[in-house]
UniProtKB/Swiss-Prot annotation:
SMART domains: RPOLA_N. Expressed in the brain, in the cortex and the white matter (at protein level). The gene is POLR3A. Changing residue 1335 to R: In WDRTS; uncertain significance. Keywords: Acetylation, Antiviral defense, Cytoplasm, Disease variant, DNA-directed RNA polymerase, Immunity, Innate immunity, Leukodystrophy, Magnesium, Metal-binding, Nucleotidyltransferase, Nucleus, Transcription, Transferase, Zinc. Two Mg(2+) ions are coordinated by both the catalytic residues and the nucleic acid substrate to enhance substrate recognition and catalytic efficiency. This is DNA-directed RNA polymerase III subunit RPC1. Its main location: nucleus. Gene3D superfamilies: 1.10.132.30, 1.10.150.390, 2.40.40.20, 6.10.250.2940, 6.20.50.80, RNA polymerase ii (3.30.1490.180), RNA polymerase II, clamp domain (4.10.860.120), RNA polymerase Rpb1, domain 3 (1.10.274.100). InterPro entries: RNA_pol_asu, RNA_pol_N, RNA_pol_Rpb1_1, RNA_pol_Rpb1_3, RNA_pol_Rpb1_3_sf, RNA_pol_Rpb1_4, RNA_pol_Rpb1_5, RNA_pol_Rpb1_clamp_domain. It comes from Homo sapiens (Human). The lineage of its organism: Eukaryota, Metazoa, Chordata, Craniata, Vertebrata. Zn(2+) 1 binds at residues 69, 72, 79, 82. Residues 843-884 are annotated as: Bridging helix. The modification N6-acetyllysine is found at residue 445.
Amino acid sequence: MVKEQFRETDVAKKISHICFGMKSPEEMRQQAHIQVVSKNLYSQDNQHAPLLYGVLDHRMGTSEKDRPCETCGKNLADCLGHYGYIDLELPCFHVGYFRAVIGILQMICKTCCHIMLSQEEKKQFLDYLKRPGLTYLQKRGLKKKISDKCRKKNICHHCGAFNGTVKKCGLLKIIHEKYKTNKKVVDPIVSNFLQSFETAIEHNKEVEPLLGRAQENLNPLVVLNLFKRIPAEDVPLLLMNPEAGKPSDLILTRLLVPPLCIRPSVVSDLKSGTNEDDLTMKLTEIIFLNDVIKKHRISGAKTQMIMEDWDFLQLQCALYINSELSGIPLNMAPKKWTRGFVQRLKGKQGRFRGNLSGKRVDFSGRTVISPDPNLRIDEVAVPVHVAKILTFPEKVNKANINFLRKLVQNGPEVHPGANFIQQRHTQMKRFLKYGNREKMAQELKYGDIVERHLIDGDVVLFNRQPSLHKLSIMAHLARVKPHRTFRFNECVCTPYNADFDGDEMNLHLPQTEEAKAEALVLMGTKANLVTPRNGEPLIAAIQDFLTGAYLLTLKDTFFDRAKACQIIASILVGKDEKIKVRLPPPTILKPVTLWTGKQIFSVILRPSDDNPVRANLRTKGKQYCGKGEDLCANDSYVTIQNSELMSGSMDKGTLGSGSKNNIFYILLRDWGQNEAADAMSRLARLAPVYLSNRGFSIGIGDVTPGQGLLKAKYELLNAGYKKCDEYIEALNTGKLQQQPGCTAEETLEALILKELSVIRDHAGSACLRELDKSNSPLTMALCGSKGSFINISQMIACVGQQAISGSRVPDGFENRSLPHFEKHSKLPAAKGFVANSFYSGLTPTEFFFHTMAGREGLVDTAVKTAETGYMQRRLVKSLEDLCSQYDLTVRSSTGDIIQFIYGGDGLDPAAMEGKDEPLEFKRVLDNIKAVFPCPSEPALSKNELILTTESIMKKSEFLCCQDSFLQEIKKFIKGVSEKIKKTRDKYGINDNGTTEPRVLYQLDRITPTQVEKFLETCRDKYMRAQMEPGSAVGALCAQSIGEPGTQMTLKTFHFAGVASMNITLGVPRIKEIINASKAISTPIITAQLDKDDDADYARLVKGRIEKTLLGEISEYIEEVFLPDDCFILVKLSLERIRLLRLEVNAETVRYSICTSKLRVKPGDVAVHGEAVVCVTPRENSKSSMYYVLQFLKEDLPKVVVQGIPEVSRAVIHIDEQSGKEKYKLLVEGDNLRAVMATHGVKGTRTTSNNTYEVEKTLGIEAARTTIINEIQYTMVNHGMSIDRRHVMLLSDLMTYKGEVLGITRFGLAKMKESVLMLASFEKTADHLFDAAYFGQKDSVCGVSECIIMGIPMNIGTGLFKLLHKADRDPNPPKRPLIFDTNEFHIPLVT
C-alpha cells in the first residue's frame, strides 16, 4: 500500500470535474475484493449464514445493523461497500453499448480490423481530432461524418477484403451481409463464394434460393476478437478516448457485483425467510447460467444447446442493466418485472431527479392554511405544536446566555423551550427531556449550541406547490400562535396562488445565521412585492379588502367622531400599537361634525405628521365616465395629493394586484418597501373591520329580477330570435351574402353566434340599469373584488349561448343536437342557447348543453396543467444557467455569450415603472411638484427650462446613464416646455415676469429646484433599475414565460371574426414556437401590397398568390370519342377568369399542363380558340389507351394553373385606420420566398409566423425577431403582459448557435455540453452510456451539475472570484511571551 498523502481533515475538497469511461476487465478485478462463484445465497445448514464467495458475501459490505463489514470492519452507516466480480464463461454484448458496437463494426473492416478510410482521409481526420477545444457536440458530429464515409466503402484499403452492411437482427444479435451485393459487376470474392456451392446446388435444388441470403453472424466472441485487433492508431478515429476505455471493453467478459448496501436483503420474521433485491436475484441467475454453460463445455453438449444458453445468458446480462428491453422473444421473456440499473437512475423517482436534483429536507412542516388579516404581510402564524418540533441551533454568547438558560429549563414540552444541547468540546448531544435541566442550564458555557424551539421573529421559508415562479417561496417572520393551522395575511395570496378551501402549505426553518439573513433580504415578502415578469405588484389587497375600501371611500360615506375613532383605532395592533395617529379636521362642522370615508382612508397612508410619506397619484378608476378628470360623475377618477385622497373611490385598479397605478406600488417606488408593506397591513386591518361593522352580505334577493327587467329581456329575446329566423330564411332561399373565405353554412353560424351573444350583453346592460347601487353582487363587480357583469347578468337575466370549442353545440344525433328538436333545426334553442337565468332555473335540454360547456372547461384545465408543467420544466432546464456577468453580458455556464447586454439595455424587468420602460416621466414630475412646491421660486419659461435641463445633465453624475435614456428625458422635457409655451401664448403671458395678475404664472409652473430634483430622481431610479450582475436571468425568464402559460386557455377557439383566418393561439402556439416546429398548424404570411388602398389591385395580387386549379376555372372537362381518335376537351370559363382577375388564358393552361407531373408531351396538347384546350392521351407499356384517358380525366382538374402550390388560400384583410381603408393579404401556407417575390407584394414588409420558414428565407436574425413577435402576440392576445426582455433572452438562446434550436431534448443536446445536465433532463441512460463511450469530461459548472454534486453554483453569490481584503492594523498588539528575553535569542549571522 502506498502511503496516502497528508491532508488536513477539515479542508473542503471541491470536485473539479468528472470523467466518464468504461472499466476494463483487469481494472474490475483490481477494484473488486472477491470473485463471486457460488450460485447459492445462504449456507444450507441451520445457521443460514451468507455463503462465502456467494452474492451476499459479507466481505462486500453489510446490509444489517448488527453485523460489521468483514473487509473494513465498519458498521452499516460508515462502510461504503466493496465490489466483487463474476467471470462470464462466454462474452456478452453490453446492452448500453450495443448501438456503439454496431457503429464500430460499420466503421472497421471485418477481416483486418483497420478502419475503412484511406491514409489521406485518416490523416485529415486525425489532424482535426488534435484540436484542443473540441466540444462534445463536435465529437458527436465528427463520429457521424466518419461513420458515413466508412459505410460508403465496401473494399478495405488495407487488405482489400470485401465488406457488406452490418445490421442489428433480433434481440442483441448482429449480422454482416458479406455476400450480398447490388452492383452489376459482381465482386470476385462473392463470385468465388457462390461458385463453391455449385456442386451442392446440383444435388439439392432447394439451396439455390437461400444462397442470396447468406450472411455472417457476428456473435460476441467474434466481435471481441475483432475489437482486440483494432490497431491503436485507429482508436481515436472511432472517437473513443484511449484513456477512458478500449473498444474491447464495450463487450462484457466480466461483471462487477455491486456492494451489499446498494441491494439490501430485507429479513421478514414471518417464515424467517428473506426478501432479496432484484439485482441479487439477477446475479444468482447469471452465475447459474454460467455454471450450466461451463458444464456443457466440459461435457461437450450439442452446439445448439450451448448457443441457446448463451443467448439466455446474454439476455439476463442485458436485463440486469436495463430491465425494460423491448423485443424479447416470448419463450425467454421474464415472468415478473424487475428493476435494473437503468430503472434506478431514470424518471421522476429515479436517482437523478428523485435523490440528487431534489430531496426531502429536515426542519420542515406542512399543514392547512387559513387567513388572518391581523398579521402583517411579512408574518406567518405557526402553531405551537409545530414550533416545539422545529428547532434552531443557537450558539451561546454573552448577549443571549440568560435567555437560553430559561429555554433549557423549560425543556422540550413547554414553549418556548429547547430540545437538545451540544456542548462545545464534546460531540455528544444531550436530550433535555430527561436529566436535571436546572443543572444543565447553570452549566451552559459560551460556544455551546442550544437547539431551541422556533420563537417569534424567526425567519422561515413558506411555500405552496405548484411552485411556478420564484414568488411561490418567500421568507416570512414567524409568530407562534395556538391552534393548528398556518395563518397569513390574505394580501399574500396572489403570489402563492392560494385559497383557503383546504390548501396546505410547507414551512422550512433555515438552520444558520447566514441562511436567515439571505432569506430575509432576497426572499423576504417585502423584497418581493412586485413580480419579475413585468414589474407589476403582486402582493396587494384582495376581495374583502377591496370591497371594504371601496365602500369606505364612496362619496356618501360619513362618520361621527366616535365611529371615525373606532374605525381608525383598528390599525393600532401589534407593532403599530404605539404609533401616533392624528385625526384630521372634520369635513362637515354643522349641524354635527362628520368625517368622510376618504379622510379615514388617508389616515391609512399617513397616520400622523411624523410620518414622512407623501404619496401622489392621479389615475382613472374602473367606472371613469370618460371626461372631466377629477369631476367624474361616477367619482371614479382617483387623485391622491401628498397622501390625502382628494377624489375617487378606491377599487381593484388602485389597490389590487396587476396594475402599476396601484397606490401601494407608488409607495414602494417612491418611499420604499417598508412604507408600502406598513400601509398594506393597515388597510388589511381597517377594511374588514369597517366592512363587518357596516354589514355586507349576499342573498337570493340580490339576484331577483324586477318586472321591468323581465319585460326588457323578453323584448330582447324576441328581437334576437326574429333576426336569427331571418338569417335562416335567407340561407334557405339562397340570399345570404357569404363572408370572405366562408361557406354559406359557416357564415350563418357566425352571424347567429354574433346575434345571440349580443342578446346576453344587452340583457346584462339592462340588468345594470335596473339594479340598485346598494346591490351586493353589483358592488363587488364594480370594485373588482369578485365576479363580473357577465356573472350578474347570467344569474338575473339570461345565461346565453353555450359555446363548445368556439362554435355552437354540434350535432350529437342524426342532423340534430338532441332528439327533442326537429332534424336540421338551426334554431337558437336547438343549438345551445340558454334563454333562462340561473334564478329562474334551466330546462333539461338547456341544462344538458350547459354541462357540455362546463365539461369542456374541466377537461381543458386538466390537460393544460400537464402540458404547461412539462413546458416549464423544459424552459427551466435550458435557461437555468444563464446569468448576467460583471461585463454586462449574459452567458451560459460554459462561457458562451447569449446576449452582449441583457435585454439590450441591461435593466431589470422587475424595476420597470412604465410599460417596458424604466420610468414614467410624467408621474415622477407630478410627484416632485407636489412634494417640493418651492413657493418662493419663479416659474421657468420654455427656453429657460431647456437650458436648465441641459446644464444639469452635463454634470459628471449623469455620465453613468446610457445616451438613449438621456435622449428620452430630453424628449420629455421638450414636450413639457412646448406645453408651457402653448399655455403662455394662449393667455398672452410674457416670459419676463411682468404680466398681471401674477397668478397666471402658476399655470404649468415648474421651478429650477423642481427640475433639478426631477433629474436626480430620474437618474437614481434608472441606476436602481440596472440588472445586478449574478442575477439568474435565465431562470426568471423561464418562470415568466411558463407561469402565465398555466393561466392561458389550452384549446384554440377559431373565432369567425378576422376574415375567418384561424390562427392557433394559447398554449399550443407557445409550444410550437419554443419547440421550433418545422410544420406549424396554421402558417400565415402577412403580405403588404405596393398599392394598399386599391381593392381591385389587392384582388389581382391575391389571384397571383392563391393556388388556382384547372378544375376551378373550367366550365367542363369531358372525354370525346371520335371514330379514329379520342381526347379530353377542357372548356375554360372566361367569365370566371375575368371576375377573379386571374392572368390565365388557354396558352398558359397548356404550359401548366405540360409542366405538371402528368407525363404529357407538348405535342399532345392542342389549343383551339381562346377557351378550348384538347389533351390527347398516349398509350404506354403499362396501361392501355382507355386507362390513360381515365387517369388524365381524374388528374387534370388538379393541375395548378396559377399561384403558389403551397398556398391553399389567401384572404384580403381590410385595416380601417384613420378613416382610410388599407388592404393587405393574409396568405395561408408556407412559401415565404415565393410570396415575397410575387409581383405587387412589398417584399420588405412581408412577414410569416413560421420561424423555420423565416430562417430559411431571411436568415437567423429575422428568425429571432419572429420568435419575439410571435410570443408577445400570443401573450397579448390572452391579456398577459410579459416584459420584452424575457422574450428576447429566450429567442436569443434559441438562435445563438446560428440555427433555430427548439427547447426539446434534441435542441437541448445541441445547446448544452454537460453530461450530468442532459442525464438529469431526459434519456438518462443513453446520455451516460454515450459519455462513457466518448470518454467525456464534465467540468461541473452549470446549475444542474452543481446541485447534483452538492457544491455552490456560480450564479449570484457564487459568481465573483475576488473577495475584499480587510485593512489590517500595521502594528498589531504584542503579547509578552515566556521566553521572550534577550538571553534566549539566537543572534542572526548575516
